[in-house]
């Protein structure tokens, strides 16, 4: 997984880390048509932009669904519920950028590392990780999730769940230019 590339065998996505200013994380996402769609989610303090390189994507941002093709772009403002999926017949390639990056590198390293071990994010893992990543499901409201996760987190820790795992730290490696 090192060298600027991560894969998620569960969602079938491939992530290529691209050069970016220190406060941002830029990634080329490659997703086949049979990918697993991310849940509707939000980043409380980061904007996430999407710029399509190849293929067709459908984005649901703030309740509005839009189809994007090559060279189209769209942004989810901080706190705006969003998701996306490959709505074409071939490989989807797009660049996503998180501004500011906060701990999104850790998010990708942890999720891809767990997926490589055959583990899917479940409630205990989400309770342990969500506050670190500042990423939440779109529903129930964030205040409810934060309260629920605060109650669950000690049990998650007792069962060995962590917000991040040292064995995955740095697995995204140095930024690469995509081929």
Predicted regions and their residues:
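Jelly-roll (double-stranded beta-helix
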Residues: 1-26, 35-40, 44-46, 51, ...
């Amino acid at each position: 997984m090192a060298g600027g590339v991560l894969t998620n065998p569960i969602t079938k996505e491939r992530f290529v880390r691209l050069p970016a200013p220190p406060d941002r994380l830029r990634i080329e996402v490659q997703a086949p048509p049979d990918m697993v769609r991310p849940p509707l989610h939000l980043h409380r303090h980061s904007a996430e932009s999407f710029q399509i390189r190849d293929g067709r994507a459908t984005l649901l941002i703030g309740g509005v669904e839009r189809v994007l093709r090559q060279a189209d772009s769209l942004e989810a403002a901080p706190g705006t519920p969003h998701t996306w999926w490959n709505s074409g017949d071939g490989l989807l390639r797009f660049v996503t950028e998180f501004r500011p990056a906060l701990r999104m590198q850790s998010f990708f390293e942890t999720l891809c590392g767990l997926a490589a071990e055959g583990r899917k994010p479940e409630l205990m893992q989400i309770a342990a990780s969500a506050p670190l990543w500042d990423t939440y499901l779109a529903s129930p409201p964030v205040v409810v999730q934060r309260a629920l996760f605060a109650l669950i987190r000690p049990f998650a820790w007792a069962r060995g769940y962590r917000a991040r795992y040292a064995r995955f730290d740095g697995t995204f490696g140095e930024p690469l230019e995509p081929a």
